[in-house]
From Swiss-Prot:
InterPro entries xrefs: DUF2953
Keyword annotations of the record: Signal
Lineage of the organism: Bacteria, Bacillati, Bacillota, Bacilli, Bacillales
Gene assigned in the entry: ytfI
Protein name: Uncharacterized protein YtfI
Extent of the signal sequence: 1-31
Amino acid sequence: MVYVLTAILILIGIVLLLRMKIHVALEYLHADDNDKLTLKITALFGLIRIKKTIPAIKVNKEDGTVDIKQKTESKMKKSSGKKKITQNDVQQSINKIEMLLHQVTRLRKISASFLAHLHITKLEWVTVIGIQDAAVTGVLTGAVWGVKGGIAAMLYDHLDFVNKPVYEVIPSFQVPVSKTHFQCIFFFRFGHAMLAAFKFVKYGRELSVLKKNPSARMTSKNDSSV
């Protein structure tokens, strides 16, 4: 009897864990030359709280220095010469292109299956932009509206919005300014995240097999078409 009750409690715990909601709040602030990114994660009915603030770029106008700056340099050797392209080289290039297309298709399917269970409770994106030339400010405002409209259409196709998102572009014709406030709050269930992670791991293993034997995908494809 004790073992049965223990098994039932464990089963209930697993079900509750898989159905647990994970809330994520993402906020990005841009004011002229300063940027700040804040990430908040809440789970287990608020018992688990994680907050991370990342000052992406901060420019000091007094001395012109940058507080956070990353620079990566690489040196490449230059070589000159002639190389003959054989039929084997062409076939390898074709296999690489096919593998790349296969990767993009699979990753898109996995991502789409997870994004379908992503629920957006709040999305707010406000931009204030302006320079000294009023005509150019108007053109920039229209361009920003176009970019936001394209992104909004793409998000509507892949995400579930609980509340209507807010998009705004405010032109400043008198004062030069560049400000952006982006805030996105969404939640998903732990079970859906685990399923997506499992699919990514499975895909990673399949990808390693394809890299070792590129013809394996073509063989499996031909077998499935028969």
